[in-house]
Amino acid sequence: MSARDFVEGEAVLDDEENENEEEQEEDYDGEVHEGAGTMNHYNDSSEEEEEDDDDEEAARAIREGFIVDEDEEIEERAERRREKRKRRREEREREDEHLDEEDLELIGELNPAFQSAAATESKFKRLKRGHKDHRQASQGIDDIFNSDEDEEAAGDYGRPSHRRPMHDEMKDFIEEDVFTDDELEREREDLEIARPAKRGVTGLGATDAAGLDENALEDMRAAFGDGNEYLFALEMEEQEEEQEEDQEKHLDLKDVFEPSQLAERMLTEEDNQIRLLDEPERHQLARKPYRNLVLTEEQFREEAAWIANLMLLKKRIEPELREPFQRSVAKVLEFLVTDDWEVPFIFQHRKDYMIHATKVPVAGAPADGDTSQYTIKAEKLLNMTDLWDIFDHDLKFRALVEKRNTIQKTYDNLQSLFNVNDSVVQDMLSTAVTMEELQDVQDYVHFQYASQLRDINLMNGEANGDTHRRKATGRSFFERVRNGKAYGLVRAFGITADAFAQNALKEGRRQYTEDPAERPEEMADSFIDNDFSNASHVLKAAKALFAEEIVMSPKMRKVIRQAYYMNGAVDCFRTEKGLRRIDEQHPYYEFKYLRNQQLSDIARQPELYLRMLKAEEEGLVEVKVRFENFDHFRQRLYPDIESDNYSEIADAWNRTRREVLDMALGKLERLINRSVKENIRQECENHVAKECREAFSQRLDQAPYKPKGMVLGTVPRVLAMSTGTGIVGRDPIHWAYVEEDGRVLENGKFVDLSIGDRDRSIPDGKDVEALIELLERRRPDVIGVSGMSPETRKLYKLLTELVEKKDLRGATYTDERDEEISDPLEVVIVNDEVARLYQHSERAKKDHPSFGPLTHYCVALAKYLQSPLKEYASLGRDIVSIQFKRGQQLVAQELLLKQLETALVDMVNLVGVDINEAVTDPATANLLPYVCGLGPRKAAHLLKIVNMNGGVVNNRVELLGVNAQYPAMGVKVWNNCASFLFIDFENADPDADPLDNTRVHPEDYDIARKMAADALELDEEDIKAETDENGPGAIVRKLFRDEAQDRVNDLILEEYAEQLEKNLNQRKRATLETIRAELQQPYEELRKQFALLSTDDVFTMLTGETSDTLAEGMVVPISIKRITDDHIDGKLDCGVDVLVPESELTDRYDIPVRALYSLHQTLPAKVLFLNKKNFLCNVSLREEQVSRPTPRPRDHMRGEWDDRQEAKDREMLQEKTQSGGRVMRVIKHPLFRPFNSTQAEEFLGSQSRGDVVIRPSSKGPDHLAVTWKVADGIFQHIDVLELDKENEFSVGRTLKVGGRYTYSDLDDLIFNHVKAMAKKVDEMMLHEKYQEGSKDATYSWLNTYTKANPRRSAYAFCIDPKHPGYFQLCFKAGENAQLHSWPVKVIPQGYELQRNPYPDMRALCNGFKLLFTNMQAGKR
């Protein structure tokens, strides 16, 4: 196995602070794992090695570009193959022509020249070494990894004994390890000497050695030729061999790309199957785990009822609508499963099945009545979200059925082989409706029939997994009891676990308990055997088994679970770490002392519960779910297991039964507690994900910005402008003008747009005229403004004032009186959440390579105004980076992505996609994956086929291959997507059908044409004449041509609907309404108007602050910008302007303000008033105010907050502060801050990597702490010992770190210690072997790499977040080897691995390889 491949790996390291050791830098030596992983061995065939080299070269060429200069690459590879074959053929010929010793002796006797040649061999070697010296000198560290040529030479020409040993699997791992001794030189030269010359030269050399002179040579050439006459035949033979070899060794994509790369590009075999199978792509992906599961009719009916009951728990539906609701759910399920229709199709074209319509007689109408004397009362039963829920529930039910089938199969085996007949399994298996209940049954079967199941596995020859072996080992005690005499005492308890559970469930008739004739202790004597040698052991064993039977009873678990959900409560307890870390300004303080939260309360605040669990993960709190009044519940269960008899014996047995029940309930409480806690988490995650979906739907549900005088849906021309994070008037204002078709026609920069004052002879800014000229020339419909700081508000005001004073107007339009008018140009602040992601993206660089990031940002702002839907759809998986709801980051990303995707699917299918526009416009093509029936694979395939068919779709049926060369999809997918792909109607095109430009599905075209004919009052003869002449679309075309669309309003749709239901059994009432609307206005814009941002939204967008992070009453840090005698001006970190009025400057009026404060000083202030519109806040610097921040309002009922614990903790913290109280140390250094470790981390959180804070140390006056940012979220705390101090408050003249490093002052320490380590961290993280992500992610990468390259090894570095200042070196020596990791410590001089220092990454990598090789050698 080639360990050379470790050069192909990557890696990372992270660190995390230990609270008790925050100011110490301790050595961390990770354990070196030396598991004996299986190594792949090399095949000792030079031919195979050469062919592998070819494969690797081909793979590398394709990886580096998909295909780059393919023809040249192929020619080069072919040339290399020819050269190698030529060498191999020459070698075989030499081997055939080898002379044995007798032949050589004979020749030597006849020709003394051979003896002399042999005698000078050693001299020849020395000469060869001499002419190689200059090349040897040039080979340095750069050639460590470039040993391919040397290896190839060795492989081609070296004798087998000179090659690497068969079992030296790590040889290639070392690529060149410091072997520069004479022996290596000699071996390399020997190999070169062994290399033969070219054919022609070889012949001449032989004759020359034989002593022939020039004349003799000429005669020989004349007689025999120069040896190259038949070279053409040899070359033809080589070409044929090459062609055969290419056919045999055809490279598939899987031979070139890693599986992860193929999956990312959707090029796997599975992707191809999804692409071509005639089934909606989303259905295929979702049902992939259950592809082979086929539901019976009975199971299908069961599923419909199961889903309806689940949904009824959360929907408020009138009792009389419950049955219609269940029927509606069943019908939707049929559409989803049997017909394979996606949710948007069902919602759009099967609406009638989601509406319950009843006829209500008109008041006062005669009873005998005319049937027309009634009105229709329609109740909507299901909405779009409900349909997606049904789709999800269908998947859950399939998982349920699959697990049930597995258990049933196990039980069937028990029945057939051991005649098992267990009513518990039979009853519970058929009635189980949740995964938990099925798991209960499975646990029961494996407990009750453990030995039989083991026998079945042995009979079947199945190897039990680790889990099964653990179960068998854990239950061997209970099996001994069950199979021994002691089980008789279990029976003597007088009631089975199942009968007791039946009593507790209040199911059926009560089961009565029988008492034996002896007391438990006395009866136990009769069951003594070899396993249990005395009565107490027997009784103890019997009680344990009976308790375990109760624990394993599915019915008993159901009792406890139901009671738990009814009586569950959540408590939150702070930990020792959380005591100090969570102060009153901390976001977790909201639940630091939260108690007695009912599960119903949690359901109303799902985000709160998820944050509690997050805080628990961080070790700050402990979240406990408990059973309220559990003792009362226990007392209620006692009568269900006790006997009703009155005697001493009965009392003794009842006491024993209660003891058993107590044992069982303790286990059950712990077991159910874990599942309840996890279930609540899942429900809360689902709830938050759905809230995000709802918020995303609202952002998607907005049409393009509507220009004045235009209809909704018209795309505007936009001029977008931004200063980014710059300051208006100082930094350039970037702008981009985007046409309505999305083309960026112009872009540039303005600097000075200030408005002059004629009265004061102040001219306009130098760029005002250029802006006016641009606006008059391009006539945009709107100016969009955004940015990343409050300065954007100033730009907005400046442009608004400019438009007003210069009377700048938008494009003209015709009003109701047919007069051309124009309105003042509107300036709007645009939501920039998509633009922020776009500006630095690869997509932006590809779209506009010459633009800068801020121009990209402006382009995205303009396109957002033109179509928010397209911009959101273009993000793909990056959509999860946008914040929709609080707590969103606590939801599993895949779950969130799935919910957001459904919102996109809903909106894309509401709007529809112009298929021909999608072919030419990438932004529109981004919508195709969300079209009903399609997905990313089918959408790409659709575009490919359309382009193959000429690049234009003339009508919808062409997608099926009708009148087209290739079909783009199958019938089922076409049925799903046809009505959502529209074709712009052109009256001149004879193939165009006007209905292809509507939301009407092709299955309803005949109905639409009939309605159009009736609206035009055409009889059958007129219809026939029109269609014969102009085709089937002629009637609708005539309706549009005559502008008679309004006539369809005169049609009575009820009669149409009744006829369709009566004659064709089709419910189409809602569909008819859709057809009527589409005939009047095809693909009408149904989205809401473009939503302008509210004041709060603008404030949050430009500052990043929300009501939770910045509000009145909070204490925040401010930076002083200007000091006067009566006020102070400052700024918050977020850019909001700060004003400190005179009354709030200080409590010390005897000291001048300028003496108290200095410019650029940062100090805490309490927010008194916040003006979000003008980005201004008033604050107080008075100590009285700052020391008493307004507590956050807590909306808790009595008993839900532990005030006593809160007061106790506050008092304890004050005591600790006072007992350890000393004068706060202040050091005159720009990096000093009076912070603790938490505050230092929070301060450095937004800083750059390598930034530093010097702070007081908790270890005393002779210590300082230095905190520096290693990486995002990772901070190292360094303890600095001060020596040679003048006094307690001065900094020591000598500073020591870790006992190893000494510095003269703080600047010396910062530069030569912290900054030096930061450089080494940068060097590591920029190295090609570094992997972003966790250790698990790096392991995953190594597994993927070695799986794709099984003969290669790999290593990589990753950051170690648990040990700041450390990285992990992860490696895997081949596909079947074990994963290992070694810690790498960052030190000022470089890195430390296994206590060996290395100055840089190259030395570290080589050092690792040597260490690894030595370790392997030691093993052998």
Swiss-Prot record:
- Which is one GO molecular function term here? nucleosome binding
Q: Does the keyword Ribosomal protein apply?
A: no
Q: Where is the composition biased (Basic residues)?
A: 125-134
Q: Which SUPFAM superfamilies match?
A: Nucleic acid-binding proteins (SSF50249), Ribonuclease H-like (SSF53098), RuvA domain 2-like (SSF47781), SH2 domain (SSF55550), Tex N-terminal region-like (SSF158832)
The cellular location(s) given in this protein's UniProt record come to:
Nucleus; Chromosome
Q: Do you know which InterPro entries this protein is assigned to? A: HHH_9, NA-bd_OB-fold, RNaseH-like_sf, RuvA_2-like, SH2, SH2_dom_sf, Spt6-like_S1, Spt6_acidic_N_dom
The record's region (Disordered) falls at 1-104, 117-167, 1186-1208
UniProt main location, coarse: nucleus
Q: Which UniProt keyword terms apply here?
A: Chromosome, Nucleus, SH2 domain, Transcription
> Carries keyword Nucleus?
yes
Q: Where is the composition biased (Acidic residues)?
A: 11-29, 45-57, 67-76, 145-154
Domain of life according to the entry = Eukaryota
Gene Ontology BP annotations: cellular response to stress; G1/S transition of mitotic cell cycle; negative regulation of transcription by RNA polymerase II; nucleosome assembly; nucleosome organization; poly(A)+ mRNA export from nucleus; positive regulation of transcription elongation by RNA polymerase II; regulation of mRNA 3'-end processing
Q: Name one GO cellular component term.
A: transcription elongation factor complex
* Annotated SH2 domain residues: 1230-1330
What does the function comment of this entry state?
A: Histone H3-H4 chaperone that plays a role in maintenance of chromatin structure during RNA polymerase II transcription elongation thereby repressing transcription initiation from cryptic promoters. Mediates the reassembly of nucleosomes onto the promoters of at least a selected set of genes during repression; the nucleosome reassembly is essential for transcriptional repression. Essential for viability.
Q: Which family does it belong to?
A: Belongs to the SPT6 family.
What is the recorded name of this protein? Transcription elongation factor spt6
- From which source organism is this entry? Aspergillus fumigatus (strain ATCC MYA-4609 / CBS 101355 / FGSC A1100 / Af293)
Q: What is the lineage of its organism?
A: Eukaryota, Fungi, Dikarya, Ascomycota, Pezizomycotina
What is this protein's gene name?
spt6
